[in-house]
Structure formats: structure tokens, C-alpha cells
Amino acid sequence: MNRLKILKENGHLIPVILEVPEEADSVVIMVHGFTSSKECPTGQLLIRRMPEAGMGVVLYDQPGHGEEEAKEDPFRIENCMDSLAAVEKYVQLKWPEKEIFYFASSYGAYLTGLYLERRKHAGTHLLMRSGAVIMPWLFLGAPGSEPDSEALEELNKKGYLMLGLTGTRQVKVPKGMFEDMMLPENDLYGNFGESDHGNTRVAMVHGEKDQVVPVKFAREFAEKYGLPITVFEGQGHSLSDDPTCPDKVADLAIDFFK
């Protein structure tokens, strides 16, 4: 396992972990979720499972996340896309003969969905794990809901909010990210079907008891855009309430990528 830094065009660095056996015929790029990092349990799962299945793994920190340089890169949608593009470019240049897959969780799945729509990309498959297909709602509230006046006052005063899911570290979310979420083109739930995703195959896996992104929305998204979805009964957003579930998700990913 190797570690390195990738320099972005905006001058920020992307910390990366690599586990790519020479004999691997493909590389899985993990795109982590909100408040997570490359060091997350899902990354460890992929490092453990993918190489033995003939796939390399690349883990990286998204802007505003992790404990290294990436946390200084503002957490904005275009910045996040730029990081994914830089990591993907590195993989293409380093291993031009290897196929690229995306394994993306929660916000990472939302971001990668937007990336497929708007950026030239090389990945042939995307697995959306607990995909936050309604991500703008999680930041702004459901359509028609009233904003939190205290949070809005703090945002306008400080220019950012510190936010996090229960039990996770908080992330600095700049005012610009809330503005990003208001843009119609960043509504993945409404816009994902407007292209062929660059010939990238997409599948979903979700927990039936997901408390962050209710499975109702995942099922509706899958039906709306003709995507296969696997729902694990009794599982929450992390898909790890049952200790055997992470490996079941890995099995599903391996089958999908193959």
C-alpha cells in the first residue's frame, strides 16, 4: 500500500492511498461521503477485498475532508469534481491499460453522478452505495420547507457552518456550497437521466432503514432512471448494522464490476 499527493490546478493537494497490484486489470476509485475520508471503514473494506478479485484500489480525501491537506481545499461541488478528475487522470496516466470503476458512497455517489453528467470521464461502472440522491434537501431542507433562521443568521455572519452527521467529525461547509445546492443543474434527482452518462453503467445499493436518505427516494430514483438497485433489509445508512453486510456489499460490487 502506497501513499502520495496529487497536485490540483488550484494549488491544493489531494492525499491518496493506493493498492494496485501489477496484475490487476482494473482500478476502483472510491469517492467517500460527507464527513468521511479515505481512511474510512469502507476504504479498508475495498483494500481488503478488491485486490484479491483482480482490482486495484485508489482512496482519496475530498475537499474539506480528512486530516491532511485536502481539508484546506474549500468544500464546493466544482472543487470536488476537480479532485475526482485529478485522481482519475493520475490513474489513466499511471495505468493506461486498466479499466476504471467508481465506488461512491452517500454524498460521494451524488457528486459522482453529477460528474458523469458534466465531465469527460473514463469510468465504465459506478456503484452508488447509500447514494444521497436528494443531497440538496439534506443541506437546504425539503422543497417548500422553511430555512432554519438561526443557522441562516450564523451562515450569513460567518460565511460557513460546521456540520456533521451524528457520531462523525464536523466539516466546514462554506456559504458557497449552499449556493451550489440551490442551482438546478445540481439537482441529481431531477436531472440524472438527461444524458447516457458517457456509457457508464450505474447500479445502486441501499439500506432499507437508511435514516439519512430514506430508501423511498433511492427506489424512486432507481425506477425513474432505470437503474438496478439492491436493498439490504434492516440496514441503515452505513450498511453495517449487520457485521456481515459490508462484505455482502463488496461481493455485489465485485460482481457488478466484473
List PLM regions with ranges:
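N-terminal cap/lid segment of alpha/beta-hydrolase-fold proteins
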Residues: 1-21
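The serine-hydrolase catalytic nucleophile loop
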Residues: 35-47, 62, 216
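Conserved alpha/beta-hydrolase
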Residues: 47-69
